[in-house]
Amino acid sequence: MPLTTYTAGQVLTAASLNANFAAAGGLQFIKAQTIGTTVSSVTVTGAFSADYDNYLITVTGGVASTSNNLYLTLGATATGYSYAGIYVQYSSATVNGTATNVATYFDAGYGTTNTLSGRIELESPFLAKRTIFRSNATSSTTTTFMNNYQGFLNDATSYTAFTLTASSGTWTGGTIRVYGYKNS
């Protein structure tokens, strides 16, 4: 939609201003959720809707009680997750691979005593079809890893919520942010 050009003395209507300043595309912020104190999981509700097909979830700040992984599940589904990917330990030049087609979660990030890290993309979690998953994360200690994983959830369920669960220990602080990729 072209922008309206105004001249001196012209009356500006709310409709015209809203049309000029509406978001044009890209990422649209949906919600942020603060991670509590010494929690082993966090459920984010109202994350997915018919407004967007694809989503970005970030996990930043906070700390873990011990080095752990961030496991992501959609709704109450605890089966049917398949993913594969690579990971590298910072103290080694060896690239490692992993794959599973019977997982109960997606491996979505890392937690250390310094920070929590996760960047997760989901395609079609609200649509009643398979959800595609991509994640990459890094940790802030030399004895831990960076990863890049991709996979899917083998079902045709519409989801509005997700849960992040610590593989061990707990988390304190940090923020989970959810963004929608604008459909255009």
Regions found by a protein language model. Name each.
Residues 3-4, 8-10, 14-17, 22-184:
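Surface-exposed molecular-recognition determinants
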